[in-house]
Amino acid sequence: HDRGCRGRGPVVIKLTFCLRRLPHLSREAFQRYWREQHAPLVAKHAETLGILRYVQCHTGHDALNGTMQGSRGGPEAYDGVAELWFESEEAMAANTSEAAVKAGAELLEDEKKFIDLANSPLWFGDEHDVVSRG
């Protein structure tokens, strides 16, 4: 397998979380909370949860997105995508310490404040680099 995380050595598993905001939030308010409140919380718990890397991709570029969606007949874009890299599935399964459970619960409670969880799919998968320039 050619799994990897640029510059971080081999990584076996990646979590991708496609986020939709709660209906009462504007995209700007959602992204600000996600960046300024939730991101530091993830950083605080990263070591406890075994998170090697955490990236937020905030939706923007509305004209480009509209063109792409129109040409494909696709659904409305997500408000953002979170990507989290972990050492392995086994390491995640073994991470059942009281501190890890508490950290995960704290993150979930915070997510309920700004993410429409019922409409925000997430999954674990493996990366396969096809093009990696720069």
PLM feature segments, named:
Residues 11-134:
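Macromolecular interaction modules
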Residues 1-11:
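Short, Lys/Arg-enriched N-terminal segments with co-localized hydrophobic residues
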